[in-house]
């Protein structure tokens, strides 16, 4: 009987110990689950925070990119306006330079034309006497030198006799009509004309004064 009682007591103690161990294991498992749950929650929160930070960073970069694009467009517009203004300035400057140059050339050359006209009249003397012949020949040589100097400065003398009348470079002082004329034609030159020519730039310094023949009306 005593052995049976001891055996039952032992079994009861083992059962209690087993139950205690089972409770301990369950408690540890519960703690572990709680820890895992907390870690999972922290990981989720950290991931969400990183995602939010990345989204904010992306928005900031996009905003900076948009601002940079706007600045580039503004600079392009500004450059285009500046370029257009510069081209207009160059065009105005070129036109002003041409105008100033024309006036300067006219002013300079006009001072020589009357003396040249006088020398031409002397050089055109018909049948000069033996005494005047050397003088007339000397004047002709001086005139050739004058013409050469003027041509080096792009100033050209023109005598349009026999050419079609051009009102832009000639001035008709008199005229006559005849069946022999199919168009207005220069038949006599009272005074030679002069023009300035440099590359494609050409303008009249003094129109030629002429007599023209015209078809009968």
From Swiss-Prot:
GO BP, sorted A to Z: protein folding
Alphabetical UniProt keywords: Chaperone, Cytoplasm, Stress response
Superkingdom, natural source: Bacteria
UniProt keyword Iron present: no
Subcellular location: Cytoplasm
Keyword Cytoplasm: yes
Composition bias, Basic and acidic residues: 10-32
A GO cellular component entry from the record: cytoplasm
One Pfam match: GrpE
Region (Disordered) residue spans: 1-63
Biased composition (Low complexity): 37-63
A molecular function (GO) term: adenyl-nucleotide exchange factor activity
InterPro entries: GrpE (IPR000740), GrpE_coiled_coil (IPR013805), GrpE_head (IPR009012)
Signal peptide: none
Function text: Participates actively in the response to hyperosmotic and heat shock by preventing the aggregation of stress-denatured proteins, in association with DnaK and GrpE. It is the nucleotide exchange factor for DnaK and may function as a thermosensor. Unfolded proteins bind initially to DnaJ; upon interaction with the DnaJ-bound protein, DnaK hydrolyzes its bound ATP, resulting in the formation of a stable complex. GrpE releases ADP from DnaK; ATP binding to DnaK triggers the release of the substrate protein, thus completing the reaction cycle.
Oligomer status and interactors: Homodimer.
HAMAP family named in the record: GrpE
Family: Belongs to the GrpE family.
This protein's name: Protein GrpE
Origin species: Leptospira borgpetersenii serovar Hardjo-bovis (strain JB197)
């Amino acid at each position: 009987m005593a052995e049976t009682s001891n055996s039952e007591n032992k079994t009861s103690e083992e059962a209690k110990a087993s139950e205690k161990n089972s409770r301990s294991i369950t408690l540890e498992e519960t703690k572990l689950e709680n820890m895992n749950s907390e870690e999972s929650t922290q990981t989720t929160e950290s991931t969400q925070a990183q995602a939010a930070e990345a989204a904010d960073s992306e928005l900031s970069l996009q905003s900076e990119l948009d601002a940079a694009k706007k600045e580039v467009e503004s600079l392009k517009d500004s450059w285009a306006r500046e370029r257009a203004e510069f081209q207009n300035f160059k065009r105005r400057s070129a036109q002003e330079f041409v105008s100033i140059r024309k006036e300067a050339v006219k002013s300079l050359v006009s001072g020589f034309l009357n003396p040249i006209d006088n020398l031409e009249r002397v050089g055109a003397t018909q049948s000069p006497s033996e005494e005047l012949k050397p003088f007339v020949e000397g004047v002709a040589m001086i005139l050739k030198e004058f013409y050469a100097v003027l041509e080096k400065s792009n100033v050209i003398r023109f005598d349009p006799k026999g050419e079609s009348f051009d009102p832009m470079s000639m001035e008709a002082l008199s005229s006559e009509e005849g069946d022999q004329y199919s168009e207005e034609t220069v038949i006599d030159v009272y005074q030679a004309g002069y023009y300035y020519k440099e590359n494609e730039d050409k303008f009249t310094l003094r129109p030629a004064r002429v007599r023209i023949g015209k078809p009968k009306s």
